[in-house]
Amino acid sequence: RYLAEHKLSTEKVSPRKIINWFSKNEPLSGYGKMILGESHILSGDKAKGIALIKNGWISADLSKSELRFFRKKYKKYLDANDYIKRADHLAWNSDHWDLKRLIRYLPKDYELLYTARHILMTKGYGVDQAIKNVPNKFKNDAGLNYDRLKWRRKKGRLESSTEILLKIRNDKDYLVRP
């Protein structure tokens, strides 16, 4: 079913058929949600369609060309917040290639945050400068601290890893992903 969802297109299959196909089973992928959303919009249910596109955008597994295609196709439905949610999803899943492609479309503050997270994930050069460039409002971001902790642990810096663990808040609101 997952592979079948990636073959669907409203240009090849009527929106009504796509909606009927998904009525038996919910979409498995973000890609499937976006195609179902587009079908709902073409069938007149704009609110449901936009919600599905926004939801699917966050987790869709897109190649470089598909990212460009869907950005252009859905630009009137997607806003900066949707791009931020997608970047967050990609960063938490350590999908650094897709994150790198998305970074340039983020607002400047978030671009700096996710650039730092990307460099930490890939063990790239300029970690200290990238972290220094992160705006103060994101210095204590759960994802950034997670990536810093992982980076330090892999570099054998156990003392400074412990320092991060002890300074972060230990509550449900802060710990986005347990």
Positions of PLM-derived features:
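Alpha-helical solenoid repeat scaffolds
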Residues: R1-P178
